[in-house]
Amino acid sequence: MMQRGESLITRARNNCVAKFLENKEWTHLFWIDSDIGFSPDSFYRLLLADKDVVAGVYPLKRENWPEAGLPAGMTQADFERMYTSYTVNTNDKNENGEIVLKVDEEGFMKVHDAPTGFMVIKRSVFEKMMAAYPELNYISDSDYNREDKGLH
């Protein structure tokens, strides 16, 4: 399912979730933003991970240029490795207060929030949220004739 011409990303995602929930045979919702590059292997890795929510890591759209300038002879690969920020946020810190990335044997890690540009969510997550938070029932403000089907 594609969302085109929607300038408000939150509304576009909410409309996608509502459409997803209308189709009972769909088991996973996979967000892939149009500006995210990924390999087919990465796609299948997330889809088959059997996690309630799982997201791929990708670079933020900014570089952290060093204040002193670039070292002589630096290659693009060196620059990307040293100065690119990624969409990883965790609260895990060691005794010195330094952030520690705890990666499991499958190459995944728990985070306190994750980017939605390359993310898979199981249907059961939405069903649990609907049961726990019925007051968050979603009605699109972009489709005034849309029937309220009780979907979030």
Predicted feature locations:
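Short, conserved alpha-helix that lines the donor NDP-sugar binding/gating region
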Residues: 9-22
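Short beta->alpha junction loops
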Residues: 2-9
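Short beta-strand-to-loop acidic/aromatic patch adjacent to the donor-nucleotide binding site
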Residues: 24-37
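Glycine-/small-residue-rich active-site loops that bind phosphorylated ligands and cofactors
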Residues: 8, 37-38
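Residue-level detector of alpha-helix boundaries and kinks
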Residues: 1-2, 106
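Conserved catalytic core of nucleotide-sugar-dependent glycosyltransferases
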Residues: 17, 39-151
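Alpha-helix termini
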Residues: 20-26, 133
